[in-house]
Amino acid sequence: MLNSLKGLLSRKNDVPSPTVISLGQVWVDIMMDIDAIPQPGGFAVANHTMPSVGGSFRVMQAASRIGAATKHAGVIGNGPWASLIRKALNDNGIEHIGQDRIDADSGFRLVLNDSERKTFVATYGAESQGNENTFDCVEPGEGDVVHISANTLMDHSASGIDAFLHRTASDPTTRDYSIVLNPTNTLHMVSDHLLEDLVLVQPIWSCNR
């Protein structure tokens, strides 16, 4: 993913200040190191617990670190997890241009790590509560890079992605900005209609799995 961004930004040197705009979701990961996953009804003690901001934040952090102006267009909530996310964005020079929800906190994931594999338990929050107007604030300029993660394609925010594509990117031959799609391992859960629309706009596929 980072190599894709570096390549795109380096090819846009003739365009002033290209911006990376992420339409992905951001949540908090709570990593818990355990000796073994407990059986149903069992008990386990975490040796180490560390909360960190995850989701599309890592892509934006990488873009910011290589010197690109970086913006987050996803939804952020109101609460302790959202506060952690906002601080991480501010600390890394990432501007939040998306919607704010005051009636829900951002979500989090419990990540149980037994040294052999990771087990995930997700609680979805404000980041997943978008609609067809979620990304109306996004107006990519010439040379910009728009990042889309598959997580945003599987819930209410998916309608916002589809609306954004139809509004700004329907003809890839005339589009003056780039789209990078990170499908992760959940693309099979995306609706056929939205997947077809994504294929038609001819994004750059970042296949890192």
Regions found by a protein language model. Give the residues of each.
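Glycine-rich phosphate/adenosyl-contacting loop at the front of the ribokinase-like
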Residues: L2-V75, P80-K87, G143
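Beta-strand->loop->alpha-helix junctions that form or flank phosphate-binding loops
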Residues: H48, A73-N78, E95-S106
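Ribokinase/PfkB-type carbohydrate-kinase core domain
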Residues: M1-V26, R86-R101, D114-R209
